[in-house]
A protein has these predicted regions:
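Cyclic-nucleotide recognition modules
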Residues: 74-132
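Well-ordered beta-strand positions
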Residues: 35, 53-54, 76, 101
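Short phosphate-coordinating micro-motif centered on Lys-Gly-acidic
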Residues: 42-47
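Glycine- and acidic-residue-biased ligand/ion/polar-headgroup-sensing regions
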Residues: 39, 50-63, 78-80
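Polybasic "coupling" helices that flank or enter modular domains
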Residues: 121-160
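Short loop/turn microsegments at loop-to-beta-strand junctions
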Residues: 31, 49-50
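Cyclic nucleotide-binding regulatory module and flanking cytosolic helices
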Residues: 1-37, 82, 87-90
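Short alpha-helix-to-loop micro-motif enriched in aromatics/charged/Gly
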Residues: 67-74
């Protein structure tokens, strides 16, 4: 993806208009385009805190993995969504790590953790945007917990 295409992607976000020209260039200089085939591990115990993922196309599964190997899906991300928990080490209120897998072939942009941290410190609008997205994803998590604890198995299957 060329610089102009990246620019078009980011101009749609509300924080963009509040960034300095220097920070905009810094973001565009540090963004990396990645492709993962279906089934690939994007973030795992071996590769933690990648940075922020901007999903251009595909489906990502964000989940917890217990020491015993049990998995609990937190939520799924789809085209044009943003994965903030892939940069959990940069978010002071997040104290756990997640696993992220590509459920379908995925094209995404990665803003690595260190440049992401610098930009968040420089721009309160970006920081607010990221925390807002994170809380929106936690609403999905709470909805899943409610289904698990408060619906019968039959109700959950019917809703699926």
């Amino acid at each position: 993806m060329d610089r102009n295409s990246c620019l078009n992607c980011f101009q749609a976000f509300p924080f963009w208009e509040h960034m300095t020209e220097e920070d905009r260039n810094f973001l565009l200089d540090n963004i990396r385009e990645l492709h993962y085939p279906a089934g690939a591990a994007i973030q795992s115990e071996e590769r933690q805190c990648l940075g922020t993922l901007f999903l251009l196309k595909g489906v990502l599964r964000v989940y917890l993995l217990s020491a015993q190997g049990k998995e609990a899906t937190l939520y799924r991300l789809r085209d044009s969504d943003i994965c903030t928990l892939s940069a959990s080490c940069m978010l002071s209120a997040i104290t756990f790590d997640v696993q992220i897998d590509a459920e379908t072939d995925c094209d995404l942009l990665l803003l690595p953790a260190v440049p992401f941290s610098r930009l968040m410190k420089n721009n309160i609008y970006l920081e607010n945007f990221i925390y807002k997205r994170t809380t929106e994803h936690f609403s999905d998590v709470i909805a899943g917990i409610e289904r698990t604890f408060f619906m019968t198995l039959t109700q959950r299957i019917a809703a699926f």
